[in-house]
Amino acid sequence: MSKSTAEIRQAFLDFFHSKGHQVVASSSLVPDNDPTLLFTNAGMNQFKDVFLGLDKRAYSRATTSQRCVRAGGKHNDLENVGYTARHHTFFEMLGNFSFGDYFKHDAISYAWELLTGENWFNLPKERLWVTVYETDDEAFDIWQQQIGVPAERIIRIGDNKGGAFASDNFWQMGDTGPCGPCTEIFYDHGDHIWGGPPGSPEEDGDRYIEIWNLVFMQFNRQSDGTMLPLPKPSVDTGMGLERIAAVLQHVNSNYEIDLFSKLIAAVAKVTGATDLDNKSLRVIADHIRSCAFLVSDGVTPSNEGRGYVLRRIIRRAVRHGNMLGAKDTFFYKLVAPLIEVMGPAADELKRQQSLVEQVLKTEEDQFARTLERGLTLLDEELANLQGDTLDGETAFRLYDTYGFPVDLTADVCRERGLKVDEAGFEQAMEAQRRRARESSGFGADYNSMIRVDGASQFSGYDHEQQQSTVTALFRDGQPVNEIHAGEEAVVVLDETPFYGESGGQVGDKGVLKAANADFEVSDTQKYGQAIGHQGKLSHGSLKVNDRVDAKIDTVRRNRIRLNHSATHLLHAALRQTLGEHVAQKGSLVNDKYLRFDFSHFEAMKPEQIRTVEDLVNQQIRRNLPVQTEVMALDDAKGKGAMALFGEKYDDNVRVLTMGDFSTELCGGTHASRTGDIGLFRILSESGTAAGIRRIEAVTGDGAIATLHQQNDLLQDVAHLVKGDSNNLTDKVRAVLDRTRALEKELQQLKDQQAAQESASLSSKAKMVNGVQLLVSQLDNVEAKMLRTMVDDLKNQLGSAIIVLATTADDKVSLIAGVTKDLTDRVKAGELIGNVAQQVGGKGGGRPDMAQAGGTDVSALPAALDSVEAWVASKL
């Protein structure tokens, strides 16, 4: 009996654990501290800094089963998913790693033992082929002489990608840095499947499938291309779990393994599909994996970055569900079956199941409203298409109006043997981006160009004033030795109490005083390891190496400290009230208020907002001590400290605790005790994106000020309704009831007036070619009453053409009515359009009723006079 996918995953980890490897949990799909990566796409991502020598671990051998996503960016498999046997947006990468421990011999021996050992995968040795880099004689000899693979099944692969060391069998992290040859292991499915061995003209067939890649990092590539040997060579291997499962379960497609078979059955059940070979089932089964795990790891659908890739995948899945005939939202219903088939690998997903389901359902609901209209428009465009390529402008219009990602449009075209002009689409997208930039009002940001060598020591945790030395000056983004009165600049100090903006906390303001100069600091920013003070020299001159007295605005800093501490209390209170799925997604802390963005799938109820506010104020009244401790990052996480999503942390981190209520990593400035905050009040709760909510709040004096404002407002209202705080609600309700009664009475009077006006007007109708025509300008009649009057006149006249007009505030309001027996000859929309054009306006409507407006009141009499001749020409 073949192993299940879950058993294969566990066997891999158990094997390497028996060889002295530390089993390390999968890292998030959102790369930790690596802005160069859109998503985690390989097992080595979480060890990148270890391989670069920037980080050290307590172990020198590791093994993982890493969740990976390849969709968007350089590694983008999206368009092939569902149409090939092995492409996925989400997959698991099994890997073993050596950090300066073992090298080629042990790496190859371990791989062979696991693949062919009787107690492990027990693959037939004669089915395995290997490739090595062309000049890697060491690896070739290990395979041939020590492992016993015949030379005819060991293939040397050279530089087959158009440059030196540009090869399928030479791995490099970038243009410089760690790199080295690799050896790949292939499985031969047999001659009943088309394809040739690697390096042959038929290598793209499905007979020989790569199952494992062993990378040997043995060189450090220099900027001039020189390859220097690394002092401690390392090993990084990767084997796709789904691929090895297909081999061990004796199937030729990843979509036939047990995991996908169960998921595909679940997709068929929720969509009502009966043909289990339909490619759309594969697409959806793949996409629920990437989407569910991305949401679980903190990504939410949006129109940029990672969120946009997630949105594209969800919408592609929904469109394929639509093709299968799904009548209702279905995608979110696949989270539960996914958790079941993934087993222990889905523990975190299971904890966040309700949040993930809600985010997916909300996005599906949102897209379903426009999917049908967008597909109809696309069908019309393709029906009229000349040639085999849809133009980029149309693809962009589908994206801009209906939220159709271009790859979804390409998907539809592909099914019909057509293509999309993706270059034209990108041109239209870039034109939109350019318009957005031009309308944003932002010019060049010279500060963003500043590059500072060296570092500044931050002393602001303990000091509000500091004697410092100027180490650098920048004017218009360029380094200078001296600045003069009236000039704006950035001043860098060797040591400073000024906090540089980070972690949501704004930078400090204050003053730098020199012997004969004052520099007013309006903001403080970080430039690498340096802290830059932005501002203006009010008088004198300031030079590099001058001594200054750096003093922050302490009143402002104190308000910021209170607001920052309140965000920590708020975060903890939200998690207690709404659930553990709540995670910080962004914040702004200044001296006036705090803004806190967090993950949650629906608007908070008023009682939940009150509960959170009360909980924070309880902690303020407890006057908890606010304490900080510096420790190793892993120790801090072990202590339960929350590491914030997307935040970059050093090896040693600052852990901030507030009694027993909150523990977070934070480098900001804070109150000494929670009681210093005084009072906390929530001003608003709103949504910023799917699955993201925002709270704005105030503390201390700001919170007290809002109480005064609300009290003053209540007093004003009480005075207006002649009441007091005890009976204010009853008084306001009485005023509203009376207002509604008067409005109803007024409407009745207006209806009576309209009926009377209509009765008097009907006698003014004249015959034009045997048809009654009534044209009239009315005074002191509201525009919205014209429609009622036209309906009344139609009933009174039986068969007629009517045009009514009124004016107010230098604007013309027009309406035309045509009884249904005459609409084959006179259309109300055409009639009103002719009149509106003469008074500087436009309008339209149905053949029997149309409205319009205009701006030229003086032209109205002549325009109405022209109606009779126009109508006569139509009769």
UniProtKB/Swiss-Prot annotation:
Q: Where located?
A: Cytoplasm
What is catalysed by this protein? tRNA(Ala) + L-alanine + ATP = L-alanyl-tRNA(Ala) + AMP + diphosphate
MF terms in GO: alanine-tRNA ligase activity; aminoacyl-tRNA deacylase activity; ATP binding; tRNA binding; zinc ion binding
Q: Name a single GO cellular component.
A: cytosol
Q: How is the cofactor bound?
A: Binds 1 zinc ion per subunit.
**Is Cell membrane given among the entry's keywords?**
no
Please indicate which superkingdom the organism of origin belongs to: Bacteria
Q: What InterPro entries would the database entry show?
A: aa-tRNA-synth_II/BPL/LPL, Ala-tRNA-lgiase_IIc, Ala-tRNA-ligase_IIc_anticod-bd, Ala-tRNA-synth_IIc_core, Ala-tRNA-synth_IIc_N, Ala-tRNA_ligase, Ala_tRNA_ligase_euk/bac, DHHA1_dom
Principal subcellular localisation of the protein: cytoplasm
Cofactors, names only: Zn(2+)
- EC assignment: the record states 6.1.1.7
Keywords for this entry? Aminoacyl-tRNA synthetase, ATP-binding, Cytoplasm, Ligase, Metal-binding, Nucleotide-binding, Protein biosynthesis, RNA-binding, tRNA-binding, Zinc
What Pfam families is this protein classified in? DHHA1, tRNA-synt_2c, tRNA_SAD
Q: Biological process GO terms, please?
A: alanyl-tRNA aminoacylation; negative regulation of DNA-templated transcription
Any domain commentary?
Consists of three domains; the N-terminal catalytic domain, the editing domain and the C-terminal C-Ala domain. The editing domain removes incorrectly charged amino acids, while the C-Ala domain, along with tRNA(Ala), serves as a bridge to cooperatively bring together the editing and aminoacylation centers thus stimulating deacylation of misacylated tRNAs.
Q: Please name the PANTHER family in this protein's record.
A: ALANINE--TRNA LIGASE, CYTOPLASMIC (PTHR11777:SF9), ALANYL-TRNA SYNTHETASE (PTHR11777)
Quaternary structure (record) = Homotetramer.
| Protein function | Catalyzes the attachment of alanine to tRNA(Ala) in a two-step reaction: alanine is first activated by ATP to form Ala-AMP and then transferred to the acceptor end of tRNA(Ala). Also edits incorrectly charged Ser-tRNA(Ala) and Gly-tRNA(Ala) via its editing domain.
- Protein family membership: Belongs to the class-II aminoacyl-tRNA synthetase family.
Q: Which NCBIfam families match?
A: alaS
Q: What is this protein called?
A: Alanine--tRNA ligase
Organism of this sequence: Serratia proteamaculans (strain 568)
